[in-house]
C-alpha cells in the first residue's frame, strides 16, 4: 500500500511519501513547486531560512501546544476549554480523542504541521545551497548553520511531544524517496545529530545574524554555538517517558554540553503588536491575565504551605477540592505581610488574587496568580520573552550530579541560587540527597535535595518554554495518574496514510501515566504528600 501526503504549510509544499509495503512506486509530484523559480534569488533563499526559525517558534510557543501542555502538567490552571486546556486537565484524566473532527485536533496538528513546515523550509534552503542553485557568497555558512539549527530544534520537539515522527533532511528525495514513521528515540537521535552539525558550522566560522532572524538581537556564531549546546542538554534530559529512562540519560554528556552552553538568559524580543504579534508566546501573554485566564495550580505552589491547607486539599477527592489561602513560606508567593484589608501582599513573582471566576470543576480553582511576565502584557508584547533561563542550566547540572554521584555540597550551592535568593529559604546545605521518587518540597523539615530540585525547577521556570514542566514531570514520574505521556500522530495524517487511528491517556489505559505511591496505599505523610 502506498500513499501520497500533501499539506499546505505556507511555504514551498512538502510532499511526503509514506512506505507501507514493498511495492514499486510510481509517483507524480503535482504539488511541489519549481524550487528554482520559488528560490530564484539569494534574497528568496535567505528569507526562507530566516523564516524557518519563526515557524519553529510559532509552532511551539503559540497557544497550542504551549498553553495546552501547561494544564496537564498541573502548573497552571484555567477555566477555558480553548487549546484543549480543559480536556487535558480533567480529573480523573481522560483518554485523548484523536480524530480529524475532534476539538482537540489543533493541539496536535498545530505543532506537527508547523514543525514539519519549519523543517521543510530549512531543508529546502540547505538543498539549494549545497546543489549550487543559489549562492549567498560569504553568508553561505551562516545560512547552512542556521538551517541545521532549525532542523534539529524542530525534530527535537517532535520527539518530545509525539510517540513517533518522520525524519526529513536534505538527503531525502521527496519526489522519489521514502519516509517512514519511526520511534521518538530515533527522531531525537536525528535531532541531536543535526544540532551537532550546526555547532560544527558555528565553531568553524565567525559571523553575526541580522537582528530579525531571532527577533531583537544580532546573535554571533559563538553565541549560537552556546545556545545549541544548551538545547542538546535540555532535549536529552526531557526526552524520557518515565523515571527509569530519566535515570539512564547520558548525564555525563549533558554536563559536557552544559559546560559549552549558555552563559546568559536567552530568548526573543516581542514585536509590540500584542496578541497579534508574530513573536508571541501564549503563557507569557496570558499568565498575568488571571481573572479570566491562567492562575497558578496548587499542585505547583502547595508544597510551600506551612499550614494544613494543602495537605487537607490533597486528602479530598478531586470533586471536593476548592480554593483556599495558603500560609506559604516562599517569598516568591507572599512577602510575609498583610495589607490593610488582610490580603497577603504580593511575593516577587506571584500574588493572592480574588475568588476564581472559572466555570469548571472546583479542583481547578486557585487564589494565586503568576505576574512574573506581566510586562509582556502591559507593554503590548514589546519586551524580552525569556525562553531559556540560566537557572535551567544550574538545575540540569544539579540533576546530572545527582545521577552521577556528584558532590552534594555543589548540588546544594546550585539549588540555593533560587531557593535562598528568590524563595527566601535557608540553605539546602546538609540536606540528604534523597531520590527521584521524592515529591517536590521546599520545607527543610521534610525536604531532600531531590525534593528541593523538583520544587525549585518548576517554580523558577514556570511558563518559560512550551511544555517544559510537562516533560520534566513525565521523566520524574510526577504526572497525575492517567495523563498521556506523549501524543499520537494527528488523525489527519493517519487517515491520509490509511493507518489505524490510535491514542493515549486515561487512567489505566495505554500511554497514561502510572499510579504514584500515594495512590497505592502508602501513608501520605510518609510520602511527603506526593500528589
Label each PLM-derived region with a short phrase.
Residues 295-340:
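C-terminal amphipathic alpha-helical segment
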Residues 14-15, 324, 349:
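Detector for intrinsically disordered, low-structure N-terminal pre-sequences
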Residues 72-74, 189, 305, 322, ...:
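Acidic side chains
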Residues 1-20:
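Sec-dependent bacterial lipoprotein signal peptides
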Residues 22-67, 102-291, 341-531:
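Acidic/polar-rich alpha-helix caps and helix-coil junctions
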Residues 75-101, 356-373:
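Short alpha-helical hairpin
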Residues 49, 53-91:
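Acidic, Ser/Thr/Pro-rich intrinsically disordered transcriptional activation regions
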Amino acid at each position: 500500500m502506498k500513499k501520497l501526503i500533501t499539506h499546505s504549510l505556507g511555504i514551498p509544499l512538502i510532499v511526503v511519501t509514506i512506505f507501507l509495503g514493498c511495492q514499486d512506486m510510481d509517483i507524480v509530484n503535482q504539488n511541489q513547486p519549481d524550487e528554482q523559480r520559488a528560490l530564484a534569488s539569494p534574497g528568496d533563499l535567505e528569507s526562507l531560512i530566516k523564516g524557518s526559525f519563526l515557524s519553529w517558534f510559532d509552532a511551539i510557543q503559540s497557544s497550542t501546544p504551549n498553553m495546552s501542555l501547561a494544564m496537564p502538567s498541573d502548573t497552571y490552571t484555567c477555566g477555558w476549554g480553548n487549546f484543549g486546556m480543559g480536556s487535558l486537565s480533567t480529573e480523573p484524566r481522560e483518554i485523548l480523542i484523536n480524530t480529524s473532527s475532534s476539538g482537540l485536533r489543533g493541539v496536535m496538528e498545530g505543532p506537527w504541521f508547523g514543525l514539519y513546515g519549519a523543517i521543510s523550509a530549512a531543508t529546502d534552503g540547505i538543498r539549494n545551497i549545497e546543489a549550487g542553485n543559489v549562492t549567498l557568497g560569504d553568508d553561505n555558512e551562516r545560512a547552512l548553520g542556521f538551517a541545521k539549527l532549525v532542523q534539529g530544534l524542530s525534530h527535537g520537539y517532535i520527539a518530545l511531544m509525539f510517540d513517533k515522527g518522520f525524519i526529513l533532511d536534505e538527503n531525502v528525495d521527496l519526489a522519489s524517496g521514502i519516509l517512514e514513521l519511526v520511534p521518538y528515540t530515533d527522531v531525537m537521535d536525528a535531532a541531536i545529530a543535526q544540532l551537532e552539525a550546526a555547532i560544527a558550522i558555528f565553531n568553524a566560522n565567525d559571523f553575526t545574524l541580522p537582528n530579525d532572524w531571532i527577533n531583537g538581537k544580532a546573535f554571533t556564531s559563538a553565541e549560537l554555538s552556546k545556545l545549541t549546546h544548551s538545547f542538546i542538554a535540555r532535549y536529552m534530559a526531557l526526552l524520557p517517558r518515565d523515571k527509569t529512562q530519566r535515570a539512564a540519560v547520558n548525564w555525563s554528556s549533558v554536563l559536557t554540553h552544559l559546560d559549552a552552553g549558555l552563559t546568559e538568559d536567552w530568548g526573543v524580543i516581542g514585536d509590540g503588536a500584542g496578541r497579534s504579534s508574530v513573536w508571541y508566546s501564549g503563557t507569557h501573554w496570558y499568565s498575568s491575565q488571571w481573572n479570566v485566564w491562567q492562575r497558578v495550580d496548587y499542585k505547583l505552589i502547595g508544597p510551600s504551605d506551612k499550614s494544613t491547607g494543602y495537605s487537607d486539599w490533597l486528602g479530598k477527592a478531586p470533586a471536593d477540592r476548592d480554593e483556599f489561602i495558603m500560609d506559604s513560606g516562599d517569598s516568591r508567593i507572599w512577602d510575609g505581610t498583610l495589607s490593610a484589608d488582610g490580603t497577603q501582599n504580593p511575593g516577587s513573582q506571584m500574588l493572592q488574587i480574588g475568588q476564581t471566576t472559572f466555570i469548571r470543576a472546583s479542583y481547578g480553582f486557585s487564589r494565586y496568580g503568576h505576574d512574573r511576565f506581566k510586562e509582556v502584557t502591559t507593554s503590548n508584547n514589546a519586551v524580552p520573552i525569556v525562553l531559556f533561563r540560566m537557572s535551567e542550566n544550574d538545575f540540569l547540572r544539579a540533576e546530572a550530579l545527582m545521577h552521577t554521584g556528584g558532590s552534594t555540597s555543589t548540588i546544594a550551592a546550585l539549588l540555593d541560587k533560587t531557593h535562598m535568593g528568590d524563595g527566601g529559604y535557608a540553605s539546602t546545605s546538609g540536606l540528604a540527597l534523597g531520590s527521584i521518587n521524592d515529591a517536590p518540597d521546599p520545607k527543610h523539615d521534610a525536604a531532600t535535595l531531590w525534593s528541593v530540585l523538583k520544587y525549585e525547577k518548576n517554580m523558577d521556570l514556570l511558563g518559560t518554554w512550551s511544555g517544559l514542566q510537562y516533560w520534566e514531570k513525565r521523566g520524574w514520574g510526577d504526572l497525575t495518574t492517567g495523563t498521556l505521556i506523549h501524543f499520537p500522530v494527528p488523525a489527519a495524517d493517519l487517515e491520509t496514510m490509511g493507518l489505524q487511528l490510535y491514542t493515549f491517556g486515561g487512567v489505566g489505559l495505554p500511554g497514561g501515566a502510572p499510579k504514584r505511591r500515594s495512590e497505592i496505599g502508602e501513608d501520605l505523610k510518609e510520602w511527603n504528600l506526593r500528589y
